[in-house]
């Protein structure tokens, strides 16, 4: 069956049209303790639990889905800035969120970059988040400058903590004014070679380069901003599934995108499915950051290999997805 699927994929690349992703489906993160994380993401982050199976949950937070699964490691390094995940937030809600984090003993660092107010904090596992407020925060002048704007260095290690969820549990069900995020802003990831990453994300992934300065670049892909830098950080572990970043792809673009990636020197998993309806595929960028393609309803998925956890025989070799890219 896989041979038939691969033969079909090989004939999918069009000379006139590059396949495209259609949006961001989800960001799935590793966690140390799933039950603790469920409390944090529901009560502190304001997420709505939308999916739960053994060992894995998903929360909807505004316009993004955050998945969580226990893993021995893989969260942002204790001294690192990358990867991190950012939400837009209004000025009023930024002040509320600062107080909210303090209320639940979550260390945080507010600062400013130009006219933008920001706050860094971590979840209990160590995944790093950023709040991004580019208008309406009245206290911005009192915030320290960003390090690259003349301010003090950020102590990312000090943002790590052992969380006591007792206060959050006690507040469940209470009528409290809660902060709200506006939308998902960006995912910023580590890369080993910035120039190579720019080529990969524009030429292969189809992103538009929208920011390129001081060792950091951003592309817009399917309406989502992805930043990358050589500053201290780490990609997805060689044998790990988390973190990974998933793009929606339309049915007509699924097989062409698989063929496009392979034609451009990207090692991919097999096209696979959990249920014969959804089409799935994993691949990495040249640094090793793990990405997923996700099509919710794909006719061709009937012929795809079924995952081992869903009663099939297909197991993803995550280490085998690492490769040397020559693009």
Where are these regions (language model features)?
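Hydrophobic, helix-prone linear segments
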Residues: 2-65, 73, 185
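Vicinal oxygen chelate
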Residues: 2-18, 24-32, 60, 76-100, 103-180, 258, ...
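Low-complexity, intrinsically disordered tandem-repeat tracts enriched in small residues
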Residues: 9, 37, 47, 57-61, ...
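Short N-terminal helix-initiation segments at or just after the protein's N-terminus
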Residues: 25-34, 68-69, 185-195, 228-232, ...
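Amphipathic alpha-helical segments
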Residues: 33-48, 97-104, 193-208
């Amino acid at each position: 069956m896989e041979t038939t699927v691969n033969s079909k994929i090989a004939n999918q690349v069009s000379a006139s049209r590059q396949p495209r992703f259609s949006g961001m489906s989800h960001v799935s993160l590793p966690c140390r303790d799933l039950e603790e994380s469920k409390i944090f993401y529901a009560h502190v982050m304001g997420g709505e639990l939308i999916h739960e199976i053994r060992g894995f949950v998903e929360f909807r937070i505004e316009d993004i889905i955050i998945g969580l699964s226990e893993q021995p490691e893989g969260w942002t390094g204790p001294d690192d800035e990358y990867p991190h995940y950012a939400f837009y937030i209004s000025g009023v809600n930024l002040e509320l969120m600062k107080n909210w984090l303090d209320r639940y003993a979550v260390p945080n660092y507010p600062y400013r970059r130009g006219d933008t107010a920001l706050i860094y904090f971590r979840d209990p596992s160590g995944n790093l988040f950023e709040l991004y407020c580019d208008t309406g925060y009245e206290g911005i002048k009192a915030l320290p400058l960003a390090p690259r704007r003349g301010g003090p260095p950020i102590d990312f290690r000090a943002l790590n903590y052992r969380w006591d969820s007792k206060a959050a549990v006690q507040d469940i069900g209470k009528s409290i004014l809660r902060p709200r995020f506006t939308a998902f802003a960006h995912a910023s990831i580590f890369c080993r070679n910035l120039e190579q990453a720019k080529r990969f994300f524009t030429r292969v992934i189809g992103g538009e380069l929208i920011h390129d300065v001081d060792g950091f670049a951003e592309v817009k892909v399917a309406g989502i901003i992805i930043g990358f830098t050589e500053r201290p950080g780490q990609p997805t572990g060689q044998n790990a599934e988390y973190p990974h970043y998933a793009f929606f792809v339309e049915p007509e673009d699924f097989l062409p995108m698989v063929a496009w990636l392979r034609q451009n020197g990207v090692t991919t998993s097999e096209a696979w499915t959990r249920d014969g309806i959804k089409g799935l595929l994993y691949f990495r960028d040249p640094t090793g950051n793990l990405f997923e393609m996700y099509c919710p309803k794909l006719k061709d998925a009937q012929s795809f290999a079924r995952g081992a956890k869903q009663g099939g025989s297909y197991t993803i070799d995550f280490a085998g997805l690492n490769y040397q890219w020559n693009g």
